Amino acid sequence: MIQSGEYYGKDDYYSRTLTKEDFWYGHGLLSPLGEDIPNPYQDISTPLTHADYEQKRASMRKEFSPDSKKLAIDLTFSPPKSVSIAMLDPILKYQLIEAHNQAVKNVLTYVESNYIIWRKHTNKGNKTEHIKTQNALFACLQHRVSREQDPQLHTHCLLFRKTMVDGKIMTIEDRFIHSNQYLLSLMYDNELSKALQERRIPLRESNSLDQKNKHFEIDGINDTLIDHFSKRKIQIQQYQDTYGLSDSWEGSHAAGLASRKAKSTEKLQDLEKMWLQDISELGGFVVEKRPEKTNSTRLLEIDTIVKNSINLLQEKSFAFSKADLMIEVYKEGMMMGITLPEFEKSFDAHLQVDLIKAGFRTLNNEVYYTTPKNIARAKYIDTILLQERIENYATLSAENAIDKIDTISSELKANYGWELSKGQKEAVTKMLSTSDKYVAIEGIAGSGKTTMLEQAKNLYQEQGVKIIGMAFTGKAAEAMETEAAIPSQTIHRYLNQLSPSTPHDTWDFSAVKKADTPEVWIVDESSMLTDHLLSNILKASEQRNAKVVFLGDPNQLLPIGTGNAFARMTLEGAEQVPTVRMREINRQEEGSN
C-alpha cells in the first residue's frame, strides 16, 4: 500500500506561503467517490487539505479487502531541473508553478479519459471486457525537494484505485496505467514546454548524458547550476551502471525506485537560503522573457512531425498503436510543446489518408493501425513466398540427404555418446533436399539449432555450396560463426554490402548479380524480423538467386503478431514455406541452443 501520509508534509507543509499547492482532481469528485470532500464549486479540481486527505484515505481503505496491499497508484511528474532552480526567483516562482500544475492537470485528464479501466468478466462465454469509466479521483501533493536535498519541484498524483460503474464503486485495472507511464511522462514534458512558452519563458534544447534523448531547460539557467543541483540524478545513473540497468527511460525509472531513501525533515525555508547561497557563489542566473510572437506554421510543423513518426513506426513494425505514435511525436516535438488537442487534430487528418485500422489488441485495450506501404509490403512478401518456381533449389535428393545425416548421427553416437534428435535430422534433411527456394526452421531454446546448423554446413560444403550466415543482432551472428563455424554478420551489414551506395535501410539491389555458384543464406533470429527487413532480404535473394533458410524461435516473436512475417510464414496448418519444428530439448553439448 502507498503510505500517503509519508508523502505529505515532507517539504514542511505548514510553513508554505501558497494556499492551493495541493489539490484533488478528477470526475470522482462529482460522484460518490468524492462526496465527503469539500467541493463548494462542484468542480473537477478543488483544494486539498491535510485533514480532508487523511479522512479520504481512511474511508477509501474500507473499500478494499484487509489483505489489499495497494490503496493508490503514484504518478509523479517533475519538470527539468532548471525549472526548480528558476523558482528561487520570486518573480518567476508563481508562473512556473502555474505552468507545472497546468501540465499535470492536462495529463491527468488524459489518464482519466483513457486509462481508468474496469475489467468486466462475464461467466456466460467466459468473456472479459475492459470498460473505460472516465471516473477517477486523484490526490495531488506538491513537493519541492529531492531526496538528496536539492531543489526539485514535483507532484505526487495519487490515483485511488476505485472508480464508479453503474452507481457502484469498483476497482480499477491498473496495468494499463503502469504500461503507459513513459507516454504520460513525455506528454507532461510537452504540455509543460507549451505552458512555459505561453508565459514567454525562454527554453533551450538539452540532451541526456548519453546524447540519445532530447529535452529542454530554461534558457539562462546554465549547466553548471543544473549539475550542482542534480545529485539525485547522478545517484540514479550510478545505480544503473552498478546494477547493469538499461540506459532507457524504463531503466532510469527502475533505478529511481530501487535507490530512493527517506527524505530528511529540514525546513524548506532553510534549504532555500542554502540554495540561494550556492547559486550566488556559482555566478547566479538571469532569465529574460521572450517577446510574444505567433507561429503561423505551427500546425504544419506538427503535421510534419506526425507524418515522419508514422514513417518511422512503419519501418519498425507492421502495426502500431496510437500510443506508440504519440510517443514518437512527443519525443520529436518536445521543444515545440505539442499539446494533446494539437496531436489529436493531426492524427484525425492522417487517419483519413495514411493510417488503416489493423485490428484491436485486447492485451492493452488499444486499436492498432498500419499503413498502405505496410499492406503493400506484406502482399509482396506473401507473393514471393507463395509463388511457384521452375528452378530446383535442392542440393541432395531426399534419400541421399537422409542417408548422409543418419551416418553423421551414428558417428556422433559412437564417438561422443549422443546422436542427433528427430527434429535436427528433419531440419537438415529439409534444408538440403527440398526444391523450394525458401525454408523455415522453428526451434525453441535448447533444441540444438547450433548443432543442426553445423552438420548442415558440413554437408553443404561437401557439395560445393557457399553458406552465408546472418542474424538480427551482432551477438547471434557471432555465435553462429564461432559455434557453428558459419561465416556470419548482421543482416543490416550484409545488405549494406550488397547495396553499398544507398543510405542505411533504403537498399537498392537492382545491380546485384546472380551468384556464380549455389548459395544458401541462413537467417537466424527470423522471429525478430520486421516486414521491412524481410522484404529486403527477399529482394536481395531474388537478385542473387540464393536459397534462404529462416531460423527462428516461436517464443521470441515480435510483440505484435499481426504483420509478423515469420509467424505468418510458419503458421501451423497454413505454412507458406516448408517448415520444420524443432521442439525437443537436447543436452548434447555445452551451450547448445
Features from the language model and the residues they span:
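Conserved ATP-binding/catalytic motifs of P-loop helicase motor domains
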Residues: 1-593
